Amino acid sequence: MSQLLSLSQLREPNAFLNRHLGPDAEEQQAMLASLGLGSRAELIEQTVPPGIRFNRALDLPPALDEAAALARLKGYAGQNQVWTSLIGMGYHATLTPTVILRNVLENPGWYTAYTPYQPEIAQGRLEALLNFQQMTIDLTGLDLANASLLDEATAAAEAMALAKRVSKSSSNLFFVDEHCHPQTVSVVRTRAEGFGFELVVGGVDELSGHQVFGALLQYPDTHGEIRDLRPLIDQLHAQQALACVAADLLSLLLLTPPGELGADVVLGSSQRFGVPMGYGGPHAAFFACRDDYKRAMPGRIIGVSKDARGQVALRMALQTREQHIRREKANSNICTAQVLLANIAGFYAVYHGPAGLKRIAQRVHRLTCILAVGLERHGIARVNRHFFDTLTLEVGGSQTAIIESARAQQINLRILGRGRLGLSLDETCDESTVTRLFDVFLGADHGLDVSNLDAEALESGIPDPLLRRTRYLTHPVFSAHHSETEMLRYLKQLENKDLALNQSMIPLGSCTMKLNASSEMIPITWPEFANLHPFAPREQAAGYGLLIAELERWLCAITGFDAICMQPNSGAQGEYAGLLAIRRYHESRRQGGRHVCLIPASAHGTNPASAQMAGMQVVIVECDEAGNVDLEDLKAKAQAAGERLSCLMATYPSTHGVYEEGISQICEVIHSHGGQVYMDGANLNAQVGLARPADIGADVSHMNLHKTFCIPHGGGGPGMGPIGVRAHLAPFVANHPVVPIDGPLPENGAVSAAPWGSASILPISWMYIALMGPQLADASEVAILAANYLAEQLSGAFPVLYSGRNGRVAHECILDLRPLKAQTGISEEDVAKRLMDYGFHAPTMSFPVPGTLMVEPTESESKAELDRFIEAMLSIRAEIAQVQEGNWPAEDNPLKGAPHTLADITGVWERSYSIEQAVLPTAHTRAHKYWPAVNRVDNVYGDRNLFCACVPLADYR
């Protein structure tokens, strides 16, 4: 008779940890044995410098299982109160079509993909982004649009920067209409300070008194007024200045588009196109400009090109504008944008089509007209003469009573000064909403009937000269998918073109494409998290308050910092926010002349781009032959900067994939010269539980929650880049003008539109830490084990360029293909494209060293998947040998022909290698074949023939 087990014996230990880690204990031992090691502890001892080791357990609560973690988080969510929020200010309730919710937002085929640097395996989301760009172009009336920015306020700041780059005016002054949203004004002011621009915020009648290089106008403005902007735009153009207009996207279905009014740049938020408010984000900003300014535009642009067979193929265009190439000379520091949310907004337009969108806009406007007429009949005056969905009302001494009445109805209004209240209707509003508002403003005995008012209130709130008369969304894609069946199949067709984590590992160095567990993702669509307005009273967001405070405590414990600022919406924005904190700190000590930022030559391109945005002078520090920061060069340049030294930006482990032994000494050099140390957190996944940035000597660091802490990359966003700071920098991090944050100085400007950035995805990172607890260190150790295993297995075929003590790498390694290219002409790009035929996304290409591939396997990939990648790389090396030996011509071989498509093998095959060698090179590909949608994309053609809108459907055939 078998022995009965007790409940404690039947409880599965480390349940989630074992789900999160790819290799099980037996596989880990096999991997360690291949390295000549007996334990992970031995590996870490050989790899991580002893001087920086964190030799105790993380101060985190014990790990919860998935059910318990979800239950606890559900308890937090239950403390949020989802009221009817009519606050507006760029945030509106919306209805996400369930076919999009289920098949995009909740679908790992969409949310686990990476930025489409490899277009051949990203044609689906590239097409979705092209739809978003076409939607933006049509609704704004301009020539060109990008594929999203972080939020409306950031987009406004980018518009200011673009205006300065292209304006022929010699002025250094930018004008902001005081009727722009206050959070936008704050972010623009913050950015202007970094750039050294003068900023004037005032009424538009003051514009004539200034010479400016550009101006920002709101349409409709923050109080709902709709003004004809043509006289102001003409005035700006007369002085060679640019007109930048922040517009409400839904209103543009009924209003004359700003491009037709003469605007040079139009920007705004696409949030109300099906993306929940989420207590502030994430949301995709749209950004459009005139064709003349295309090379000055920030962010990603999707363009139409052709592939090797001459077929239509999409790609990211004009990448030479961007930070990963131009560094401190880049147009922007944008890296992560908001691709997943842009896709949702674009699909919202595809699903509803032009007629459906117009009906939504007309309905919102009609309800607003009925409300305006009813209130006016009872003597409540309207401040804004014209309107789309927003009313600003004079209520005088009744303000307090009306606010209390609204609270009784669980309605949030916008509270303004001077006895005024504001409200904005949205697509979730209906007749009952209007009736409730009549009750709030007039009392229950108002006697108004919505149906009667609907028949009587014929007048539009939009002035006739500003009614839209041009067509929009005329491309067939916006008319072909209005049934759920057709939409579902369209989404699936696009998804099938792409390669994401749900199909294979994505070994991108410096990107940490780890598991995004389903239990971590579930809470983001809970209504209690998804449907809160970011400016709702704090007591209505008590659950968010608990979640954010707890997450901040955990991140402090993990990093050693004293305080966290959650506002940055991406890693690059975290860099910018951290550098601003350093700048403010120096200024508080009357050392405002400290503006030199030292950056290692190996740094990610966002580092110098962010430093330039923060008003700093970038000085490059060289690296030695081992890939480490050249300590003597660092000392010399710190000495030369002297009292002008602001900071050092350093990545740890380095972007070369090693733990630099001298990192503490590097920090000491900077501190001895009065500078601060900014640690780029891109590689934090190799530190958690093993070392802490603050202990090493960092004063500030950003944490990529979309890397280390499991927020998915979304095909290019969303991301989150909160910063950790030591106590002396804590007063100088970002604050917010609408929702003041405890801790930072009140005068500190915002860096993003919402006080806690993209708050609705914070539950993902909360869940990850709650599920792992102190065992987060296990994840770091297994990530290091996986990287060293790959390095060991591949080093005989592809030399590992850099290694640290005992020949070990950190969590990633760089494979050097330069010798092979010199011998055979086979490049790192050829290998990257060939990996697609094996069913893999390529490693990071030519960063940080040209001619190399940087591989990061993460802790989440099984040994079987690692071995499959090793098999693919060794097979590719054998193919290169065939070229070396002359068996295949230098220009006719599987690498130069890669990637191969179904179209290749269904036509005439006249190549020096077989079809099987081309498309079925391994047993796995014969059983589970992924087909790239297009052949190799012609990048040069795409940039020389720039076209960034939807192409005729016939061109795809």
UniProtKB/Swiss-Prot annotation:
The keyword Oxidoreductase applies. This is Glycine dehydrogenase (decarboxylating) 2. Its EC number is 1.4.4.2. It catalyses: N(6)-[(R)-lipoyl]-L-lysyl-[glycine-cleavage complex H protein] + glycine + H(+) = N(6)-[(R)-S(8)-aminomethyldihydrolipoyl]-L-lysyl-[glycine-cleavage complex H protein] + CO2. Belongs to the GcvP family. GO terms for biological process: glycine decarboxylation via glycine cleavage system. The keyword Oxidoreductase applies.
